[in-house]
C-alpha cells in the first residue's frame, strides 16, 4: 500500500522496495496438477465485461485494454474468464487499479487463482513481504537492473523462468510508479502468431523438436555484475521443453524458445542448433506485426499468458528516473508438445503464399 509517511521525492511504496540477501535460499514449487481456470470460463465473458466501459484492441494479434474493470472486484467466474481472454489475446491491460493497494496477501490470493506462485532464484522481493513477489526497481539509488542490461539494446524477448518444469501461465505485472512523461514500456509478442507466420513445411520441421532451457547464463550474469552481493537462492535449473507447444485451453500452437533461457536443440550438433535458434530468435525480434506495446501509468496492471507470448522491457527513459513495479508469476501446466499434422489446407487459403508458389 501507499505509505502514509512518504519522504520527499522518495518511493510511494516503500513496503515494496527490493531486498537483496546473498545468503537467502528458497524452495522450488514441486510437481502439481494444473487445473486451468480458462477451461471453466464462459466464452462470451459476461462477468469480465459486465463493467467494462470500453474494450480497446492494442493490435490485431495481441493485446486488449479493458477500461472500467477492477480486477479486485471480479468474481471467481470473472477470473476464469480473464484466464480465457488472456489466453486468446496474449495480454490484457487494466488501468487505475486498486490492486496496487490491496496488500501482499490479497494480491497473492488473486494471482494464485491461476496457479501456485513462483519464487525467483535471484531477483529481489520486498524485505518484509512474501518471497513470491518479484520487485522491479530502477532509480538513482538502485541501478542494479540498469547495470544488468549494459548492452547496446536491452530488448530481449523472453518467457520468465521457462526452465521451470512447469513454466508460468497468466502473469501479473503491476506498475507502482512509472517514469515521468513516457518510457519504460513493455513490448509483448504473440508466439502463436509467430508460429503461424512460418511456412507450413517449416512449421512441420519444428514440430517434434525439443530444446534445453537453463538459468545458467542469467545466474552467471548475476555473479558477474554483483560479485559477493550476488543473490543465488536456487541452483541452476535445466529442463527440456518442446520447441512448439499447444495451449491447453485454446489449442493454439506457439513457439516456445527464447533467447534468455533456450540453450540448444536436443539431438542437433552445436552449429546446427545455433543456426536454427538464431533464425527463430531473429524471427521473434523482428515480428513487430504480431506485437503490442504497453505504456504504463501508476496503477496499471498488465496480465500476459507466457505460454503464448514473450515480452521485453524497454530502457528508453533517463537513468535515475524511478520505475517501480512488482510481478506475481503463477506457474501452469507441463508444456504440451505439438504433434506433426498432415496438410490442413490452410496454406492454400493464403493468397500471398499461393501467388509465390510456396504451397
Curated annotation (Swiss-Prot):
Lineage of producing organism: Eukaryota, Fungi, Dikarya, Ascomycota, Pezizomycotina
Record-linked InterPro entries: AtsK-like, TauD-like_sf, TauD/TfdA-like
Oxidoreductase keyword on record: yes
Chain positions recorded as substrate binding sites: 120, 327
Cofactors, names only: Fe(2+)
EC class name: oxidoreductase
Full protein name: Alpha-ketoglutarate-dependent dioxygenase cnsM
Source domain of life: Eukaryota
Amino acid at each position: 500500500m501507499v505509505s502514509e509517511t512518504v519522504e520527499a521525492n522518495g518511493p510511494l511504496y516503500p513496503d515494496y522496495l527490493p531486498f537483496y540477501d546473498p545468503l537467502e535460499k528458497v524452495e522450488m514449487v514441486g510437481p502439481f496438477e494444473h487445473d486451468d481456470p480458462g477451461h471453466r470460463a464462459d466464452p462470451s465473458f459476461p462477468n469480465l465485461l459486465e463493467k467494462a466501459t470500453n474494450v480497446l484492441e492494442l493490435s490485431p494479434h495481441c493485446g486488449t485494454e479493458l477500461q472500467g474493470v477492477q480486477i479486485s472486484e471480479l468474481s471467481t467466474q470473472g477470473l476464469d474468464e480473464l484466464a480465457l481472454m488472456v489466453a486468446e489475446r496474449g495480454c490484457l491491460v487494466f488501468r487505475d487499479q486498486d490492486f496496487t493497494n490491496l496488500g501482499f496477501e490479497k494480491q497473492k490470493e488473486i494471482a494464485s487463482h491461476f496457479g501456485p506462485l513462483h519464487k525467483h532464484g535471484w531477483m529481489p522481493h520486498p524485505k518484509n513481504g512474501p518471497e513470491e513477489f518479484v520487485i522491479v526497481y530502477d532509480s538513482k539509488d538502485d541501478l542494479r537492473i540498469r547495470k544488468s542490461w549494459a548492452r547496446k539494446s536491452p530488448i530481449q524477448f523472453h518467457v520468465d523462468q521457462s526452465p521451470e518444469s512447469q513454466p508460468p501461465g497468466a502473469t501479473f505485472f503491476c506498475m507502482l510508479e512509472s517514469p515521468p512523461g513516457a518510457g519504460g514500456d513493455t513490448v509483448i509478442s504473440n508466439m502463436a502468431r509467430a508460429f503461424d507466420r512460418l511456412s507450413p513445411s517449416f512449421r512441420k520441421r519444428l514440430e517434434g523438436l525439443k530444446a534445453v532451457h537453463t538459468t545458467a547464463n542469467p545466474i552467471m550474469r548475476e555473479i558477474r555484475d554483483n560479485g559477493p552481493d550476488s543473490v543465488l537462492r536456487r541452483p541452476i535449473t535445466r529442463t527440456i521443453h518442446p520447441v512448439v507447444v499447444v495451449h491447453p485451453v485454446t489449442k493454439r500452437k506457439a513457439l516456445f524458445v527464447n533467447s534468455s533461457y533456450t540453450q540448444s536443440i536436443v539431438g542437433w550438433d552445436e552449429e546446427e542448433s545455433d543456426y536454427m535458434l538464431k533464425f527463430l530468435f531473429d524471427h521473434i525480434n523482428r515480428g513487430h506485426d504480431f506485437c503490442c506495446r504497453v505504456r504504463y501509468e501508476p496503477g496499471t496492471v498488465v496480465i500476459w499468458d507466457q505460454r503464448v507470448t514473450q515480452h521485453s522491457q524497454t530502457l528508453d527513459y533517463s537513468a535515475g528516473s524511478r520505475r517501480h513495479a512488482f510481478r506475481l508469476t503463477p506457474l501452469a501446466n507441463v508444456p504440451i508438445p505439438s504433434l506433426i499434422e498432415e496438410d490442413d489446407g490452410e496454406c492454400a487459403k493464403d493468397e500471398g503464399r499461393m501467388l509465390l508458389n510456396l504451397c
